[in-house]
Swiss-Prot record:
The gene is cyaY. GO terms for biological process: iron-sulfur cluster assembly. Gene3D superfamilies: Frataxin/CyaY (3.30.920.10). One of its GO terms (molecular function) is ferrous iron binding. Involved in iron-sulfur (Fe-S) cluster assembly. May act as a regulator of Fe-S biogenesis. Keywords: Iron, Metal-binding. This is Iron-sulfur cluster assembly protein CyaY. Belongs to the frataxin family. It comes from Paraburkholderia phymatum (strain DSM 17167 / CIP 108236 / LMG 21445 / STM815) (Burkholderia phymatum).
């Protein structure tokens, strides 16, 4: 994948997260600064989603740990266990929000 293809796909992920959070019932604040999207929950915990262009990855830093995702066969997948990006982010957000959170493309 070229660098421009990576950026187009990765930027679309950040935009999709923002749209999902705008529509979510959960009270999750978010702020974007360049390639970094910070989600802040009512309890003060945060999830950081950031783009890593040199590696063509998207990284998530959550209370449960750090996760790296790479675009494989049309989806962003965890480089360790193959979990799909939106499913993983929804799970981490649900854990930190203490209520169901669904983040979808």
């Amino acid at each position: 994948m070229s660098d421009s293809e990576y950026l187009t796909r990765a930027e679309a992920v950040l935009a999709a997260i923002e749209r999902s959070l705008d529509d979510a019932d959960a009270d999750i604040e978010f702020e974007r600064s360049g390639n970094v999207l910070t989600l802040e929950f009512e309890n003060g915990t945060k999830i950081i989603v950031n783009l890593q262009p040199p590696m063509q990855e998207i990284w998530i830093a959550a209370k449960s740990g750090g996760y790296h995702f790479r675009f494989v066969d049309g989806e962003w997948r965890d480089t360790r266990n193959g979990t799909e990006f939106y499913a993983a982010l929804s799970e981490y957000a649900t854990q930190q929000a203490g209520e169901p959170v669904e983040i979808a493309p």
